[in-house]
């Protein structure tokens, strides 16, 4: 065979999957060489992997199951790389979660796993993972209904992260187990998208769940908007383009976000926006499939959600319109302190725009805030409808995705531990490290409600 791409000469764990592309001398024969740990290398065609994955479809999350398709004029090398990553991600998932399946072991040429209960852990935690005691707890940087977010430092690497700690008891009482597991699933499949927060570790003990995430200390978009009252069109366009890219990516993965608001958009130290908090995401939303759960934040709810009608991905485009409106004018459209009055306005009141904005901006907001979802911008071609709108004509989308554009505003950030852009309401909350990393509880805990929650970031590759 001919050339090999991405050949990594490094130490690997016994259950770590590596995969390389091998292209024949005729440039047509392509196989994918897969190896688990330091075991034997197996070479199979893409079709062989795809056939097997199809037989094991029930074991594979829908968010990663769809095979990559070649785009028009896409280079072969990029297409092979996307296929390689797809094979790698699914293989690692099967090895981590389904080794008790005889078919999986046979396909990957693996021996039967040890049945000793003392050696069983949750999913990917069979690998070397993090624990609560691996971190120093520095500052509180956020809080929610189920827990708080902390700035933490990994004791060994000294790297700064954001750690979200949730109470299992509160999650169960509120019947939110599915939402938390959906958040975990979305996070592990973000593939380091430039505008989606990345998960580095997740783990648990008897009482708590832990998400270890990118630390973004440029502040919430909400706090910057509150301080400045409103943004210019050009600055709003930059942020709206990033949000649209993130939503479009999630939609490609058949995920509806459902909770877009300025509080869930964080700035990094370069001035780029990153979407966070995936607790209300809905998975497995292929094509025009609908759902009907009433959820979201009142100011940004689409009419069909308020009316408890079936809704689809276009609710996210309504939210984008609401956030863009708020960036331009300072408040969400149809805003009222009285929620019932606001809901009535969202459903019945015509959209009114001031005349101090450009025609393309006015047309975009109007298109996104169509009360009839079948007429809403994004209904036909999803992200492409938004990307191709005249308002975004000045945006170089490739440079934006590669983070090569200069942000219109760069927050003042001294270093990774700087909390000057974080609300004092959070920073002043005292931390009790002993309650966050209790010594008396098992590091890992068999808990069927949160089975397969544990994760460690090892082979995250941008596709």
Curated annotation (Swiss-Prot):
Residues 393-463 form the AGC-kinase C-terminal domain. Phosphorylated and activated by pdk-1. It holds the Pfam family Pkinase. The keyword RNA-binding does not apply. It is found in: Cytoplasm; Nucleus; Apical cell membrane. Expressed in late embryos just before hatching. At postembryonic stages, expressed in sensory and motor neurons and in the intestine. Highly expressed in the intestine and head and tail neurons. The keyword Metal-binding applies. Changing residue 126 to K: In ft15; suppresses the defect in expression of vit-3 caused by lin-29 mutation. Disruption phenotype: A mild developmental delay, extended generation time, an extension of life span, defective egg-laying and decreased body size, but increased lipid storage. RNAi-mediated knockdown abolishes expression of the vitellogenin vit-3. This is Serine/threonine-protein kinase sgk-1. Transmembrane segments: none annotated. One of its GO terms (cellular component) is nucleus. Keywords: ATP-binding, Cell membrane, Cytoplasm, Developmental protein, Kinase, Magnesium, Membrane, Metal-binding, Nucleotide-binding, Nucleus, Phosphoprotein, Serine/threonine-protein kinase, Stress response, Transferase. Acts downstream of PI3 kinase age-1 and kinase pdk-1 in the daf-2/insulin receptor-like transduction pathway. Essential role in regulating development, stress response, and longevity. Phosphorylates Forkhead-related daf-16 and the longevity-promoting skn-1 transcription factors, which inhibits their entry into the nucleus and antagonizes their function. Promotes the cytoplasmic localization of the transcription factor pqm-1. Plays a role in the intracellular trafficking of proteins such as mig-14 to the cell membrane, and this may be through positively regulating ceramide synthesis. Belongs to the protein kinase superfamily. AGC Ser/Thr protein kinase family. Its EC number is 2.7.11.1. Residues 135-392 form the Protein kinase domain.
């Amino acid at each position: 065979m001919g050339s090999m791409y991405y050949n990594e000469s490094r130490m690997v764990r016994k259950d770590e999957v590596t995969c390389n592309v091998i292209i024949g001398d005729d440039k047509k024969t392509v196989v994918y060489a897969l190896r688990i740990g330091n075991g034997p290398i197996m070479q199979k065609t893409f079709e062989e992997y795809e056939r097997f994955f199809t037989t094991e479809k029930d074991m594979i999350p829908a968010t990663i199951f769809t095979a990559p398709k070649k785009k028009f004029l896409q280079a072969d090398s990029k297409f092979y790389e996307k296929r390689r990553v797809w094979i790698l991600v699914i293989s690692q998932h099967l090895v981590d979660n389904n080794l008790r399946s005889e078919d999986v072991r046979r396909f990957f040429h693996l021996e039967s796993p040890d049945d000793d209960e003392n050696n069983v852990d949750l999913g990917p935690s069979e690998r070397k993972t993090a624990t609560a005691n691996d971190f120093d707890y520095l500052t509180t940087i956020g809080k929610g209904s189920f827990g708080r977010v902390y700035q933490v430092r990994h004791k060994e690497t000294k790297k700064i992260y954001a750690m979200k700690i949730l109470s299992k008891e509160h999650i169960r009482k509120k019947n939110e187990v599915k939402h938390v597991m959906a958040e975990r699933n979305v996070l592990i499949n973000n593939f380091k998208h430039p505008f989606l927060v990345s998960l580095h570790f997740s783990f648990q003990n008897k009482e708590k769940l832990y998400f270890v995430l990118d630390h973004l200390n440029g502040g919430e978009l909400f706090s910057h908007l509150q301080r400045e009252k409103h943004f210019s069109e050009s600055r709003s366009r930059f942020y709206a383009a990033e949000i649209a890219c993130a939503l479009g990516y999630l939609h490609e993965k058949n995920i509806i976000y459902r909770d877009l608001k300025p509080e869930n958009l964080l700035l990094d130290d370069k001035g780029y926006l990153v979407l966070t908090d995936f607790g209300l995401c809905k998975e497995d939303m292929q094509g025009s499939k609908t759902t009907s759960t009433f959820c979201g934040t009142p100011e940004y709810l689409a009419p069909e959600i308020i009316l408890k009608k079936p809704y689809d991905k276009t609710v996210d485009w309504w939210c984008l319109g609401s956030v863009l409106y708020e960036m331009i004018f300072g408040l969400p459209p149809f805003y009222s302190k009285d929620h019932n009055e606001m809901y009535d306005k969202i459903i019945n009141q015509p959209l009114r725009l001031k005349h101090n904005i450009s025609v393309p901006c006015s047309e975009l907001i109007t298109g996104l805030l169509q009360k009839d979802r079948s007429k809403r911008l994004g209904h036909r071609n999803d992200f492409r409808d938004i990307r191709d709108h005249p308002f975004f004509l000045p945006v170089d989308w490739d440079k934006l995705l590669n983070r090569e554009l200069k942000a219109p505003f760069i927050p003042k950030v001294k270093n990774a531990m700087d909390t000057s852009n974080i609300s004092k309401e959070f920073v002043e909350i005292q931390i009790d490290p002993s309650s966050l990393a209790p010594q008396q509880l098992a590091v890992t805990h068999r808990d069927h409600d949160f089975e397969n929650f544990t994760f460690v970031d090892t082979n995250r590759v941008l596709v």
